[in-house]
Amino acid sequence: MSTVNELVNRIDETYEVSQIEKEIKLDNIALSDLELLATGGYSPLTGFLGKEDYDSVVETLRLANGSVWSIPITLPVTEEVAESLKTGEEVKLVNNGNIYGVIQIEDIFIPDKEKEALLVYKTTDEVHPGVKKLYERPNVYVGGTIILTKRFENNQFPSYRLDPIETREEFKKRGWKTVVGFQTRNPVHRAHEYIQKSALEIVDGLFLNPLVGETKSDDIPADVRMESYEVLLQNYYPKNRVFLSVFPAAMRYAGPREAIFHALVRKNFGCTHFIVGRDHAGVGDYYGTYEAQEIFTNFTIEELGITPLFFEHSFYCTKCEAMASTKTCPHGKEDHVILSGTKVRELLRNGEIPPSTFSRKEVVEVLIKGLKKEVVTE
């Protein structure tokens, strides 16, 4: 399937901002969203959502024009800031004293956050990290088209930070007609590896695209994860069939809705297929094991523009002596070693070394070293 959808480009580093007086301070989530809006990662969006699109996304998982979009990309400001703004004006977008862009204000509105929590996250429980963040952020939303006037400096992983136009170019250069995207916020364990390699059997290339934006505090730090991906790819994957690049967005933990969002974004990066495993983008027990796969039945592949590949929970079977899933293994649960990112994190934090059935030894070494460093700096 072709992914030649038009990429939005809202970057203009020559844009004159010196005459613009008013400013909105961006938090880290809004800052990463600004970059992804401008580079086309969030195509077809050209800015932060106005009320009509926001309501439509929250209620129907579509923009007002009917295009599929499942996560509201919003710019929250305080009541005090909102009172100083009016529609029709241009305002600077600032973070940490740097001007990164401007927004042409089209809308200023107060959202129903409880409704947003219930429909987007399926819960109003403030223990849920996505809901907690939603309630912590300011209460008024500003909508409008953006322009990115300054690219980010001091990026972590500069050599792995590619815009959608660049990843598309890379895939083309490699002659890949079909590319499967894999989203992760965890180190890659053996179950992930099994799924990725199964998918790689039917496409030309694998795009490993770990999320490195804001995550919850007990997730393994991005720099440690990146090193673990590097050693894994170096030792266990064919170099000409995989490509590693980071996804600078914040994690929403919105489960099924975020699975759709992750697929749409990977389409923009140039993927034709996207892997959806068990409890994709889930947290705790808020979502059913395969709910993130079931949500895709609400949309056609044509309107998504990308083909989801669904995988069941995989495990190491001691009888098969191999990675397997219930589709390929006849043995009972007592023979299955269940692997999960949570379990790997738990073992490591307790100072235990995960067995080789869980994780490659090179990966485990990187994680142990990284977590030791973390303890020292805490």
UniProtKB/Swiss-Prot annotation:
Question: What's a Pfam family in this record?
Answer: ATP-sulfurylase
Signal peptide stretch: none
Q: Name one GO biological process term.
A: sulfate assimilation
Organism's domain of life? Bacteria
The UniProt keyword set, sorted, is: ATP-binding, Nucleotide-binding, Nucleotidyltransferase, Transferase
- What is catalysed by this protein? sulfate + ATP + H(+) = adenosine 5'-phosphosulfate + diphosphate
EC nos? 2.7.7.4
Entries under SUPFAM superfamilies matching the protein:
Nucleotidylyl transferase (SSF52374), PUA domain-like (SSF88697)
- Part of which pathway? Sulfur metabolism; hydrogen sulfide biosynthesis; sulfite from sulfate: step 1/3
**MF-aspect GO terms:** ATP binding; sulfate adenylyltransferase (ATP) activity
Its family remark reads: Belongs to the sulfate adenylyltransferase family.
Provide the protein name: Sulfate adenylyltransferase
Gene responsible for this protein:
sat
